[in-house]
Design a protein with these regions (language model features):
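Conserved hydrolase catalytic core segment
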Residues: 156-163
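Glycine-rich nucleophile elbow surrounding the catalytic serine of serine-hydrolase chemistry
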Residues: 143-154
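The feature captures the conserved acid-bearing segment of alpha/beta-hydrolase catalytic domains
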Residues: 163, 172-228
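Structural recognition of the beta-strand scaffold that forms the well-ordered cores
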Residues: 27-30, 81-83, 140, 163-167, ...
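Alpha/beta-hydrolase-fold serine-hydrolase catalytic core, especially in secreted/extracellular enzymes
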Residues: 1-10, 203-303
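N-terminal cap/lid segment of alpha/beta-hydrolase-fold proteins
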Residues: 1-27
Length: 303
């Protein structure tokens, strides 16, 4: 799938649709972080063994492509899933990551990499809502690392979300996670709490988020309590390095099962699937080339 979020700037990604489902279906947006090759992540056999030996993953298929594992199971649970590219990753290559909006003129005009990605996410919501089978009242988003940052940003910018799941949210380590004036006098915990009372789950890892259960979650619960929504905020620490592995995904499956009313038997377990090789995931090929009007950062800035 690809569509223009701005004239000459295209959002690309894969659309997963469940089979044999009637009626209106929930939709889940899946932004991703700085994984090697982005949407096309394809781990080596040695990396797969490491993931399984550490307990982070159970199956070679999910270890090979944990991003596909997430999308495949959500589709099996009855969700329409849009797994879309961050700017400069996957098929979105006209603007190099993380360049493009670091010049003085862009900053003075509050044009930023993060702003463009967030606009892409808003337009991704528009896209899934244009699908006739999607239930407009059951739209969710989930991502890890800078995909978690993008998840928070979308929840702040768009009120159409019914549930939010953040895994290892970043304070900001790249221009795609920082915009001018974004965190002046505040932080990610406070920003994430602004989506209350929308249901929100947070998975923390053995990284800069490892103390979230004691520093972050209590404060977010206090905000949710003001709305009488204590049962809509969850947080859990998993003792693994920065990731969106099986354990974080299982928390997410259960969270969406509850708040999107999927009706899936608990506990939700991943089922075997065959990951699709990167070449087949690509939106563009000889028969379907990149649109001729696709522009770079300068073109987006001019617009």
């Amino acid at each position: 799938v690809f569509f223009a979020s701005l004239p000459g700037h295209y959002v690309s990604g894969n659309l997963y649709r469940p089979k044999g489902r009637a009626g209106k279906l929930p939709a889940v947006l899946c932004p991703y972080g700085h994984w090697p090759d982005g949407r096309f992540i394809w781990r080596t056999d040695a990396e797969i063994r490491g993931e399984i030996d550490s307990g982070a993953e159970k199956t070679p298929q999910a270890a090979r492509s944990p991003l596909q594992a997430r999308c495949a199971l959500l589709a099996r649970m009855g969700c329409v899933v849009f797994h879309y590219d961050m700017v400069g990753y996957g098929d979105s290559r006209k603007i190099e990551h993380p360049l493009g909006f670091t010049d003085t003129e862009s900053v003075l005009r509050l044009q930023s990499f993060m702003g463009l990605q967030t606009w892409n996410s808003i337009r991704a919501v528009d896209f899934v809502l244009s699908l006739p089978e999607v239930d407009e009242k059951r739209i969710a988003v989930t991502g890890a690392s800078s995909g978690g940052t993008q998840t928070i940003a979308l929840s702040l910018a768009d009120q159409r979300l019914a549930a939010v799941m953040v895994s290892m949210n970043m304070q900001g380590g790249c221009v795609c996670e920082n915009a001018p004036l974004y965190r002046v006098g505040t932080n990610n915990v406070e920003l994430a709490a602004l989506c209350a009372p929308t249901p929100q789950g947070v998975a923390a890892a053995k990284d800069w988020t490892e103390d979230f259960e004691t520093r972050g979650l209590p404060q977010m619960k206090a905000i949710y309590r003001l709305y009488g929504a204590d049962d809509r905020i969850e947080g859990r620490f998993f003792p693994y390095p920065h990731n969106y592995n099986l354990h974080s995904r299982q928390m997410m499956y259960g969270f969406f099962n509850k708040h999107l009313k999927l009706g899936w038997p608990e506990p939700v377990e991943e089922k075997p699937f065959e990951p699709i090789p990167p070449a087949q995931l690509s939106v563009y090929d000889a028969a379907h080339p990149v649109p001729s009007d696709a522009t770079d950062a300068a073109g987006v800035r001019r617009w």
